[in-house]
Amino acid sequence: MIKAVVSSLIGIGLAGLLVGCGGKENGEDGSGKATAKKVLRFSAIPDEDTTAQKERFQPVADYLAKALDIEVEFVPSISYGASVEKFENNDIQLGWFGGVTGVQAMTRVEGARALVAGEKDLAFKSYFVANASTGLEASDDFPAAIADLKFTYGSSSSTSGCIMPSHFIMENTGKAPREFFKETPGFSGAHDKTAMQVQDGTFQAGALSFGTYEKLVAAGKIDPEKCVKIWETPPYADYNMTAHPDLEKTFGEGFLDKLQQALVDCQDEAALKALSREKLVKVDNETFAGIAAVMEKVKFD
């Protein structure tokens, strides 16, 4: 439910004092009434390095503030679910979501609109990985042997770290994950944690975003000889930037189109690096209909 913003008595009293002095400060419009501060608040799912979210995504906020000539504030989220809850409560009006959390946001807020995705998000993949000690190697065939291993997902709300891997387990084995695995799977909470925990042997196998795995290998944080990619899924749509309909009330009719175009036009290296994307492209809610259908079959919460 969208929460209304109510001025406090203290704020009204202060506004009255300022009017008496003939000022127009603190958001007054000259009529003696305090005006609401116009801010676009933006958040993102904590898919990796959850302690450095603000530092990571501030360049996106800076780019949008400059491109749209408005104030933009990044608001960290402690979990996937928290990012959707903030959006539902209108505490944020723009979210960098995964496919699952994006669908959740669109479902819970009538009029919410998916604006953009990275080019690679239209053909995203998950990697199944295993500790080298298991003896499993890369194959085009689904790794059915992981049924006997200690396995971890990322977050239970992660598209590439849980929902789609579970979908492909079901598609290839005819069994739900709880039936397929001999031991109940774990949840690391984030893609990078999945890779690290498989590499150090905390878990024997896991599933994560292909992009995170490749980035960790390129940075030397993961040794592909120790955390071995054993299978990659078929492609699916994933990450997206979804906007709250109230932005049109705050910034005027047509603002969502302007926001979408600003994101598509983005060539700011720091902003694109924050999103781990080279280019953003237009999408709409229908782009994620396939994810919505999978979510009806695969449920963990």
Regions found by a protein language model. Give the residues of each.
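C-terminal motif of bacterial Sec signal peptides marking the signal peptidase cleavage site
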Residues: 17-20
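Bacterial signal peptide processing site
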Residues: 22-25
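Extracytoplasmic "Venus flytrap"
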Residues: 32-57, 280
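Periplasmic-binding protein-like
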Residues: 41-46, 119-127, 221-260, 273-290
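Ligand-binding cleft/hinge of the Venus flytrap
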Residues: 58-69, 145, 160-187, 215-222, ...
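Short helix-initiation/N-cap motifs at beta->coil->alpha
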Residues: 74-85, 98-100, 177-196, 237
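A ligand-binding cleft/hinge motif common to bilobed small-molecule-binding domains
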Residues: 96-109, 170-171, 197-200, 204-224
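A conserved helix-loop-strand patch within extracytoplasmic ligand-binding domains
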Residues: 118-173
